Amino acid sequence: FIMGMSKKQWDRLNKDKKQPLYNRFRQVWCPGSTFKPVIAAIGLQSEAFTGTDNFGNEGHSWQKDKTWGTYHVTTLHTYSPVILKNALIYSDNIYFAKAALKIGTEEMERSLSMLGFHSSIPFEIMMAESKFSNNKHIQSEVGLADTGYGQGQVLVNPLHLACIYTSFCNDGNVLKPYLLYKENAKAEQWISEAFSKSVSQEVLEGIKSVVNDSHGTGYAIHRKDMILAGKTGTAEIK
């Protein structure tokens, strides 16, 4: 800790465009592709699709129909078959846009609300609330599709997203975060049975492949001495 600073130093920090004093971990951010495992779990849990359903190869650009005007969902890779595990490996925007449409607006809003969106996180430090829409309702079909790959109006607190990911390795239960180390601590559940054991296991296998499959977007952190799981994510501004 420092004992103080000059006014010149303080002004320089406050005027820095990179905002070094901004408490980023408490805020919400566009999750981008890190949101895809969440959509996968919602889709499987709601039986909107199965992990073996082939969504079809659309190339690098897709729109549902002409009512979308000039708007297209784009992706970087083509592959076959277009099933859930491969969609996670290649981080396919088009697959997850289609997945969101299959889930539907009502189920998407219900499931995300159940996962703690538009609600406070049970944590010692107050965090900004994650949200799937500016007004708690997904307004359009394009907005729903964009939600599927972590864009649209979706904003997520990083701690909240990490909590949801705990469900994939805890039989579908979302664990409660805590700040201070506890000796021999036992995990506390925040959201019990958010997903079934089979759904959480299927998503876990998918995000293991993201890291351990040579085509996976997270293969750079692959290790031979342990099995890692995760999901890459890059948000974009269109």
Which residues fall in each region the model found?
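Beta-lactam-recognizing serine transpeptidase/beta-lactamase-like catalytic domain environment
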Residues: 1-33, 38-238
